UniProtKB/Swiss-Prot annotation:
The keyword DNA-binding belongs to this UniProt entry's keyword annotation: yes
PANTHER family: ARGININE REPRESSOR
Biological process, per Gene Ontology: L-arginine biosynthetic process; protein complex oligomerization; regulation of arginine biosynthetic process; regulation of arginine metabolic process
Family: Belongs to the ArgR family.
An example molecular function term from Gene Ontology annotations: DNA-binding transcription factor activity
Protein name per the record: Arginine repressor
This protein's UniProt keywords: Amino-acid biosynthesis, Arginine biosynthesis, Cytoplasm, DNA-binding, Repressor, Transcription, Transcription regulation
Keyword Lipid biosynthesis recorded: no
Pathway it works in: Amino-acid biosynthesis; L-arginine biosynthesis [regulation]
Role according to the record: Regulates arginine biosynthesis genes.
Organism the protein comes from: Vibrio cholerae serotype O1 (strain ATCC 39315 / El Tor Inaba N16961)
Length: 156
C-alpha cells in the first residue's frame, strides 16, 4: 500500500473514532488505532493529528470529557466566499505564494492542508494575509501553481 493511501486510511480511522465521542485521553486513541491495525501510531502523532483537525475536549452525553471534532471546526471547502478571499496567486522556482484579505490566510491554508500530498502539497505556512505552499518532489511548482489557480478560479 502506498504511503499516501496509508495516511488517508489513518486519517479516516482517526476521524471515525473521534466521532464516537468516547476517548478521554490521547492514549485511548492510540490504543484504538493500534487495534485497527495502525501499528506505527504513537501519542505524539495523535497529538499532532488532534491539533491539525481542530479537535477539542468536551463533555459527551454521559458527561465524560472526550475528544471530538465539532462540525463547526470541520475542514472548509472552496466555496465562493473563500474564492473571494484570494487576492493574488504567484510562484517562483521554489514555492507558490497566495495573498489574501487581512486575516484570511489561516482559513485558506486549512483548506490547502486538507488536500495534502495527494494533490502535490508538501506543506503550507500561513501568516495573516500571505500563504507559502511547498510542492512535493514529484510535482513541479508551475503545475501546483496552476492547480491552486484552478481551485480558487483565479485568472490573475
Amino acid at each position: 500500500m502506498r504511503n499516501v493511501d496509508k495516511q488517508d486510511n489513518l486519517v479516516r480511522a482517526f476521524k471515525a473514532l473521534l466521532k464516537e465521542e468516547r476517548f478521554g485521553s490521547q492514549g485511548d486513541i492510540v490504543e484504538a488505532l493500534k487495534n485497527e491495525g495502525f501499528d506505527n501510531i504513537n501519542q505524539s502523532k495523535v497529538s499532532r493529528m488532534l491539533t491539525k483537525f481542530g479537535a477539542v475536549r468536551t463533555r459527551n452525553a454521559k458527561m465524560e470529557m472526550v475528544y471530538c471534532l465539532p462540525a463547526e471546526l470541520g475542514v472548509p471547502t472552496a466555496s465562493s466566499s473563500l474564492r473571494e478571499l484570494v487576492l493574488d496567486v504567484d510562484y517562483n522556482n521554489a514555492l507558490v505564494v497566495i495573498r489574501t484579505g487581512p486575516g484570511a490566510a489561516q482559513l485558506i491554508a486549512r483548506l490547502l492542508d486538507s488536500l495534502g500530498k495527494s494533490e502535490g502539497i508538501l506543506g503550507v505556512v500561513a501568516g495573516d494575509d500571505t500563504i507559502f505552499i511547498t510542492p512535493t518532489l514529484d510535482v513541479p511548482v508551475k503545475e501546483l501553481f496552476h492547480s491552486v489557480c484552478e481551485l480558487f478560479e483565479y485568472a490573475g
